[in-house]
Amino acid sequence: MEIGNSPIVKKITGCILLFILLWGPAVLDEPAAGANNLSKSIQHLLAFVKNSECQFFRNDKAHTAGEAAAHMQRKYENFKDKIKTPEDFIRLAATKSLITGKLYYVKLKDGEKITSEAWLLQALETYRQNQR
């Protein structure tokens, strides 16, 4: 009796093929789903910045929310290949000046001034909780 033609091998092969047919598309599509989630998270953060009524400080100069979002979008385009998580986006595109190293700050409606990193990480956490 050949092993390759035995009933047990045929059953195992059949089970493996069935598994691949049923679960293969989901497994193969996972990276695309991850990229889609990353894109959605980043777009949410950019919209969050743009639609806020906050003032942004970059190198000690005040900017509108729209200007801040546009600046972050440009930095995102420059670092796209290095950004694998929303936290990477915040760290690379929305935290500090590449030239001076100075942190970005956000002046909230109540006058409190916090780093853009802390503000955006909090916004990201809220977004994730709402996605559950």
Where do the protein language model's features map onto the residues?
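Short linear motifs in intrinsically disordered/low-complexity regions
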Residues: 1-6, 30, 49
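Bacterial N-terminal signal peptides that target proteins for export
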Residues: 2-16
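Bacterial N-terminal signal peptides
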Residues: 14-26
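Sec/Tat signal peptide C-region and signal peptidase I cleavage site
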Residues: 26-34
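N-terminal secretory signal peptides
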Residues: 33-78
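Compact alpha-helical subdomains of small soluble proteins
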Residues: 60-132
